[in-house]
Amino acid sequence: MADLNINIGKLKFKNPVLAASGTFGYGIEYSDFVDLSKIGGIFTKGITLYHREGNDYPRMAETSSGMLNAVGLQNRGVTYFIKNIYPKVKNIETNIMVNISGSTIEDCVSCAEKINELDKIPAIELNISCPNMKQGGMAFGTNCSNASEIVNAVRKVYHKILIVKLSPNVTDITEIAKAVEIAGADAVSLINTLIGMAIDIKIKKPILSTVTGGLSGPCIKPIALRMVYQTYKIVKIPIIGLGGISNSDDAIEFILAGASAIQVGTYNFIDPTISTKIVDGINAYLDKYHLLSIKELVGELL
């Protein structure tokens, strides 16, 4: 059996298959029917400094080859997480990483500072796709200056592994990736959801209460692959690839394009055990082609 171990900075993962934020709860919800120790890591649902109610319903819609969501980062805040969720997840036998976001840089910094104190949380994933309320609602991750500013601020207070989740809703994602690398990111994860919408033709109204939402699922995979491939040529830090992954072949494509690890997102709603199946599939692929380590595949597109 091949070696599936990978490293993001100084953090070691038993394999490159990770559960994406917002699709796997805090992990503990699935412990009765998924062997969490077989997954390389779990990114928690998004956590903010304060309690958030999220958006009005309806806030999810199925599409022909994916789904739209506009949940709006509903969560009970970082203090609730620390007091009530952390004690339940800290002993799960895999890397539990917290996805954080905020409406201001100050909120993100405060949230990161609190998570930094948790011994059993080795990394955070900073979501920079959220609107910056001090800049007219423009998302932090849509220009290099804002992206660099927020990553630099979080880096000053967060002393473990800092992963930055990039938005695909930009002209050139490689410029943003390079900016956050320079600002201190240990890795980048890409891509987050694309902006889309759906319409109910019977009532002539948008299906989502917010009109638009984040598009995910198989339909975005070719775009995600292209962006991972382009980014791999530009940055030196590890890339975590995500977007439409539903089987081990998809995962291997991302790794060949340059991803050191992958995240499974939307498909968790269809099959919560998919991550363990992908691990088995990657193992089988490496054995079939007589490869000794997953590292031999990263960026090896001919």
Curated annotation (Swiss-Prot):
It is found in: Cytoplasm. FMN binds at residues 21, 45-46, 99, 127, 165, 191, 217, 243-244, 265-266. It catalyses: (S)-dihydroorotate + NAD(+) = orotate + NADH + H(+). One of its GO terms (molecular function) is dihydroorotate dehydrogenase (NAD+) activity. The active site is at 130 (nucleophile). Its main location: cytoplasm. Substrate binds at residues 45, 69-73, 127, 192-193. One of its GO terms (biological process) is 'de novo' pyrimidine nucleobase biosynthetic process. Gene3D superfamilies: Aldolase class I. Its EC number is 1.3.1.14. CDD domains: DHOD_1B_like. Binds 1 FMN per subunit. Heterotetramer of 2 PyrK and 2 PyrD type B subunits. This is Dihydroorotate dehydrogenase B (NAD(+)), catalytic subunit. It comes from Azobacteroides pseudotrichonymphae genomovar. CFP2.
